Amino acid sequence: MTLALQYKRILLKVSGEALMGGQSFGIDVFVADRIATDIAEVRAMGVEVAIVIGGGNIFRGVAVASHGGDRVTGDHMGMLATAINSLALRTSLTKLGVETVVLSAVAMPQICESFSQRKAIGYMNQGKVVIFAGGTGNPFFTTDSAATLRAAEIGADVLLKGTQVDGIYSADPKIDPTAKRFDQLTHVEILQWGLSVMDTTAVTLARENNVPIIVYSIHEKGGLAKVLNGTGRFTMVSE
C-alpha cells in the first residue's frame, strides 16, 4: 500500500509478546530498545505518540480463570504486568533522550502517575510520549479495548497495532499458507467475518468513535515510520 498518510497524534498498541523477542517469557531489553528507537524516529518527525502495552509476556488474567481461579484477581495481576512493561519501555525511550511519562489506570503513586484525560493530552501537547499502563483499570477488558478507549479519549488520529505479521489475514498465515491478506477493511467487515485482529469490544468501540486502525508488523526495524509515510505494508481499517 502506498497511500500517503498524515497523522499528528497516534496511539500505538504493543503486545506484551512483542517484548519477549526470542524468549519464552519476560522482556528482551534489545527488543524494547529497538521498539523505542522506532518510536523515537516518528516522534522526531513531529508525531505525538501515546502507547498501550499488553502484559501477556508476563501474565494473562484468563490463565487464572482457566485453572479455576478468580478472573478478577487474574486481570488485576495482568494490569500489574502492563505496568512492568510500561516502565521497561519508558526506560528504553529515556535512554534515547525521549521524554516519556507513564500514566496508570490503577493508582500506584510511588511508581507512576494516575491517568486522566486532561493530563495525558497536556503531556502530549508538551511533546512527551505518554504510556498508558493498567489497561482500562477494570477486569474483563483486554488491552486492545484499553488502546481503543485511550485513542478515543485523547483524540488520536489513528490507532496502530503492532503485531507478529504485516497486516490482517483471513487466517493465521503461520498456520494456513493460503490465508488471504487484506490491504483495506472496514470495522464492520472485521466483525462480520470474525477476523481475529482485536476483540469485538475493541473493534466496536473504534467503529462507534470513528477511530481508524492500522495493523502492521512491529518486528520490522523502522516499520512504524514507513507505515506513517505510507510506504510500509499494513492493513487499514476504516469506515
UniProtKB/Swiss-Prot annotation:
InterPro entries in UniProt: AceGlu_kinase-like_sf, Asp/Glu/Uridylate_kinase, Uridylate_kinase, Uridylate_kinase_bac
Cell compartments where the protein resides: Cytoplasm
Binding positions for UMP per the UniProt entry: 55, 75, 136-143
Activity regulation: Inhibited by UTP.
Biochemical pathway: Pyrimidine metabolism; CTP biosynthesis via de novo pathway; UDP from UMP (UMPK route): step 1/1
Assigned GO CC terms: cytosol
E.C. designation(s): 2.7.4.22
Cytoplasm as UniProt keyword: yes
Biological process terms in GO annotation: 'de novo' CTP biosynthetic process; UDP biosynthetic process
Primary location class: cytoplasm
Catalytic activity reported: UMP + ATP = UDP + ADP
Keywords: ATP-binding, Cytoplasm, Kinase, Nucleotide-binding, Pyrimidine biosynthesis, Transferase
Name of the top EC class for this enzyme: transferase
Binding-site list for ATP: 13-16, 56, 60, 163-164, 169, 172
SUPFAM superfamilies in UniProt: Carbamate kinase-like
Summary of subunit composition and partner proteins: Homohexamer.
Family: Belongs to the UMP kinase family.
Function: Catalyzes the reversible phosphorylation of UMP to UDP.
PANTHER family listed in its UniProt record: URIDYLATE KINASE (PTHR42833), URIDYLATE KINASE PUMPKIN, CHLOROPLASTIC (PTHR42833:SF4)
Protein name as it appears in the record: Uridylate kinase
Organism name: Bartonella quintana (strain Toulouse) (Rochalimaea quintana)
Gene: pyrH
